From Swiss-Prot:
Phenylalanine amide, modified sites: F9
UniProt organism field: Calliphora vomitoria
Keywords for the protein's UniProt record, in alphabetical order: Amidation, Neuropeptide, Secreted
Subcellular compartments: Secreted
Location, primary (coarse class): secreted
Gene Ontology annotations of biological process type: neuropeptide signaling pathway
Similarity-based family: Belongs to the FARP (FMRFamide related peptide) family.
Coiled coil: none
Designated name of the protein: CalliFMRFamide-7
Single GO cellular component term: extracellular region
Length: 9
């Protein structure tokens, strides 16, 4: 979410 888009996986 927001700046944590890299945690989508």
């Amino acid at each position: 979410a927001x700046g944590q888009d890299f945690m989508r996986f």
